[in-house]
Design a protein with these regions (language model features):
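A structural signal for multi-pass alpha-helical bundles of membrane permease subunits
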Residues: 16-305
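Short, Lys/Arg-rich, polar N-terminal cytosolic tail immediately upstream
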Residues: 1-19
Length: 305
């Protein structure tokens, strides 16, 4: 019988390590299963459906393999002139909404960072509140603001009875205003984080050299904050392409809603139940988002270097 204490200690450590590994696998396994069931499988199945003729509403399709039709859904989407109008409308929304969020968010962050005054922390907290609200609630709230009869928006601006929710000339701008109001604080927070991380000695050295405010802004502030601004731009661009709940709260799903891709995808997939067509449109949107964000990520990697 071997009573070597070192060998016993090594055996105990090996057993304990094996036990910890087993426990780790037991705890991680349910998460992996849920990830596969809730994400990977729907992603794969929707890709299969995009190459088929299938409607989830037809009870005759239940348990039946979908009829494969190749790239017909994709060809139909890309050859539809109305679909290109929706692409253009979505691009307008993204450019307007994200552009205003970046400008306003960074501008407010600059003011809060440079100007010292009593109650700045309280004001910052108030400015953050919109992004903590549910998007559907934000949409309904702005729908009440936009009401042409009793809404406060037209009353405060003295614009008369403009219907920002149903008028096709204004409903897109109505959604832009609500989205900018809600998500400008997100850009502001990231900008404040970037501005706070700029070393103070750089500004002190610039002061000694009697550098102008523009030199300090363009050569010190912007290069240091630029990576975080790109992060904000990436996240907001992705979310703007997929916007749905704010639009639903403001305009509903009817014909009065702005002709955005996300709203059309909802109507196709869950109102008319053209499941395969909706899946193909969803993957086209996914490719667009990946392509655009890849460009931003490329610039982000350059900025880090």
């Amino acid at each position: 019988m071997n009573n070597n204490p070192r060998k016993k200690r090594a055996e105990n450590m090996a057993y304990r390590s094996m036990k910890d590994t087993t426990l780790l696998r037991i705890f991680v396994l349910p998460v992996i299963i849920l990830l596969i069931v809730m994400n990977v499988f729907p992603l794969f199945w929707s890709l299969v459906l995009s190459f088929s003729d299938y409607s989830a509403k037809k009870t005759t399709n239940w348990g039946v393999n979908p009829e494969m039709i190749g790239t017909e859904n994709y060809s139909q989407i890309l050859s539809d002139p109305k679909m290109w109008n929706r692409f253009i409308t979505t691009a307008k929304f993204v450019l307007l909404s994200v552009g205003l969020q970046m400008i306003l968010g960074f501008g407010i962050a600059l003011l809060l960072h440079q100007v010292k005054f009593f109650g700045k922390g309280f004001l910052t907290t108030l400015l953050i509140l919109p992004m903590t609200m549910s998007p559907v609630i934000v949409g309904i709230m702005w729908k009440l603001f936009y009401n042409p009869n009793y809404g406060m928006f037209n009353m405060l601006l003295g614009l008369g009875k403009i219907d920002w929710t149903t008028d096709p000339n204004f409903n897109l701008f109505g959604v832009v205003i609500a989205d900018v109001w809600m998500w400008t604080p997100f850009v502001m927070l990231l900008s404040i984080a970037g501005l706070s991380a700029v070393p103070q000695y750089l500004y002190e050295a610039a002061e000694i050299d009697r550098a102008s405010w523009w030199y300090k802004f363009s050569r010190i502030t912007m290069p240091m904050v630029y990576p975080l601004l790109l992060v904000a731009l990436i996240f907001r661009t992705m979310e703007a392409f997929k916007i749905f709940d704010v639009v639903m709260g403001i305009t509903g799903r009817g014909t009065t809603a702005p002709q955005l891709l996300s709203m059309y995808l909802y109507n196709v997939g869950f109102v008319t139940w053209q499941t395969s067509y909706g899946s193909a449109l969803g993957y086209i949107m996914l490719i667009m988002i990946i392509a655009i964000t890849s460009i931003f990520i490329k610039y982000l990697n350059r900025a880090k270097q």
